[in-house]
Design a protein with these regions (language model features):
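Positively charged n-region of N-terminal signal peptides that target proteins for export
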Residues: 1-4
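Bacterial N-terminal signal peptides
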Residues: 7-18
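Short, low-complexity N-terminal intrinsically disordered segments enriched in polar/charged residues
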Residues: 17-61, 176-183
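A solvent-exposed, acidic/Ser-Thr-rich amphipathic alpha-helical stretch
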Residues: 33, 37, 55-116
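Hydrophobic/aromatic beta-strand elements that line small-molecule binding cavities or substrate pockets
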Residues: 95, 110-115, 129-131, 146-152, ...
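Short, cysteine-centered beta-strand-loop-beta hairpins and adjacent loop/turn segments enriched
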Residues: 101-102, 131-141
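A short, structured loop/turn motif at beta-sheet edges
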Residues: 115-123, 138-139, 151-157
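Short beta-strand edge/turn micro-motifs at domain boundaries
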Residues: 143-175
Length: 184
């Protein structure tokens, strides 16, 4: 009986051990720390080019594909307030229009920049930031945004496959709580 108990314990321990190994492998980032650091450096370069209004440099940062995407403020009412711009020609035109509108300053909170691997050739970055821009009715005061980028490895370089810029809505105004009067 004791031998059966020991055998069952060893079998269960082996089963749980292999389950833990499979679970930890599934949760491991598919990109190593060095690669994630390279993508962080590419993010810094993207911010630098945007702040310099270097449209040609920004063009080279994007994946050259009709599937490349930029989500940004639209100046055309029929597109809605925010719209997706697909393909490099549309992205280049949108970036040109934004840069031509006046000063544009992107100030990311690098302490909150997060880069994760999704696959060996795909990563995603997230960064809250303030953006100062006078494009499409924006008043040129810094406002909070979130920038979410999907990075795609092309040859030996990491390119922006999609860049989604989302405005952070203002916090709701707290309304005073009305207390009902007590009757004695």
């Amino acid at each position: 009986m004791q031998k059966m108990l020991v055998a069952a314990t060893v079998t269960l321990a082996a089963a749980f051990s292999s389950f833990a190994t499979v679970a930890s492998a599934a949760n491991r980032d598919p990109l190593d720390g060095r690669t994630l650091g390279i993508i962080e450096t590419r993010f810094d370069k993207l911010m630098d080019l945007a702040n310099k209004h270097d449209i040609n440099g920004l063009h080279r940062m994007f994946w050259q594909s009709p599937s490349a995407l930029l989500v940004a403020k639209s100046a055309i009412p029929s597109e809605g307030s925010w719209a997706g711009f697909w393909g490099n020609d549309a992205i280049d035109q949108k970036l040109h229009d934004i840069a031509a509108s006046g000063p544009v300053v992107l100030t990311p909170d690098l302490s909150k920049l997060k880069v994760v691997g999704l696959a060996p050739d795909v990563a995603e970055s997230y960064a809250p930031m303030d953006i100062t821009v006078s494009y499409a009715g924006q008043d040129g005061t810094p406002k909070p945004f979130l920038m979410i980028i999907t990075w795609k490895k092309v040859a030996k370089d990491w390119k922006v496959a999609s860049e989604i810029i989302l405005p952070v809505p203002p916090a709701p105004v707290a309304r005073p709580v009305q207390q009902s009067g007590r009757r004695s």
